[in-house]
């Protein structure tokens, strides 16, 4: 059952690509160089060989931090990274080799943040750190959409009390029903009103890419934003987190109108409000460099949402 859940079939991109050109110190093209990309979290390696034009491409990489190694006859081994690869992103990482013995290594760790120069797509990617650090109302990922340029909502509080025709952002002047929500490439839109049909725990998300314009043809069905959410996966190391968000009426300020209700004592004038939200994540390896799993749980006011995200790691060299 675990192995069956690990394989996801999707028409929407939930991975990234690393590409670039290999040259020597003079700028001349160097073909037939072996390029290896290593995922820092899972230690999974993906390899490719630069073609006659010195160009290499490593597609379908799970999001995360990567280091690339370049090895060619007559040149020192070159190591670049780590650097991030985001969902649906093409990272250009050119490699410059230095003449010398293969046993020698040139390591470059101060890598500039990759710029998105391969597409004209507009939008923004929210990392897991930014998502967990933000004071999102109700810990609802839809609230984060309001941080994206071009997104507005006349009633921001409605994201947690969504009824028909509410609870989402208006993006680039389009109606709120024109947004498209994807989770690991799977459509999670509410079939009745196109709201988000399933809201994962913020702590379960690796990153959220909000595309607002010039998206590729694979992301159809939306004139507004495409919200492409990617779940975390396990890694070779065991890791986890716990959280508890607490609010009640003792933490809220009183309102002008509540103060006018003199029939009630002062401590009863404010509307009763209590909110407890707690949960956590736990992930780690099942088999080192081969299989891992991540478990998450969130409870809000007695309603429990659980998510299991097993992941099969690709064999080294594939």
What are these model-derived regions, one by one?
Residues 44, 249-253, 302-306:
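Outer-membrane beta-barrel proteins
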Residues 2-127:
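Periplasm-facing N-terminal accessory domains of Gram-negative outer-membrane beta-barrel systems
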Residues 51, 75-233, 248, 252, ...:
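Periplasmic N-terminal accessory/gating domains of Gram-negative outer-membrane beta-barrel systems
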Residues 234, 239, 269-318:
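Transmembrane beta-barrel wall of Gram-negative outer-membrane proteins
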């Amino acid at each position: 059952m675990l192995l069956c859940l690990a394989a996801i079939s999707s028409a929407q991109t939930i991975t990234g690509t690393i590409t670039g050109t290999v040259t020597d110190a003079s700028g001349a093209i160097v073909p037939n160089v072996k390029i290896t990309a290593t995922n820092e979290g899972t230690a999974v390696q993906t390899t490719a060989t630069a073609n006659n034009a010195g160009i290499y491409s490593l597609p379908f990489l799970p999001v995360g931090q990567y280091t690339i190694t370049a090895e060619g006859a007559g040149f020192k081994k070159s190591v670049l990274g780590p650097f991030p690869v985001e969902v649906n992103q093409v990272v250009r990482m050119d490699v410059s080799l230095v003449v010398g013995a293969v046993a020698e290594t040139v390591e470059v760790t101060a890598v500039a943040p990759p710029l998105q120069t391969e597409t004209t797509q507009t939008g923004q990617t929210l990392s897991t750190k930014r998502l967990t650090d933000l004071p999102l109302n109700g810990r609802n990922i839809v609230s984060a959409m309001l941080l994206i340029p071009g997104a507005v909502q006349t009633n921001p509080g409605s994201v947690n009390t969504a009824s028909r025709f509410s609870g989402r952002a208006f993006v680039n002047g389009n109606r709120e029903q024109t947004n498209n929500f994807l989770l690991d490439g799977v459509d999670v839109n509410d079939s009745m009103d196109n709201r988000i049909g399933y809201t994962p725990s913020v702590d379960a998300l690796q990153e959220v890419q909000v595309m607002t314009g010039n998206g590729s043809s694979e992301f159809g069905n939306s004139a507004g934003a495409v919200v492409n959410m990617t779940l975390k996966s396990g890694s070779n190391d065991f890791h986890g987190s716990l959280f508890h968000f607490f609010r009640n009426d003792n933490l809220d300020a009183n309102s002008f109108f509540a103060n006018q209700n003199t029939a009630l004592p002062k401590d009863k004038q404010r509307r009763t409000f209590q909110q407890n939200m707690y949960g956590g994540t736990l992930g780690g390896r099942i088999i080192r460099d081969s299989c891992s799993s991540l478990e998450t749980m969130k409870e809000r006011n007695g309603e429990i949402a659980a998510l299991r995200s097993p992941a099969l790691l690709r064999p080294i060299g594939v």
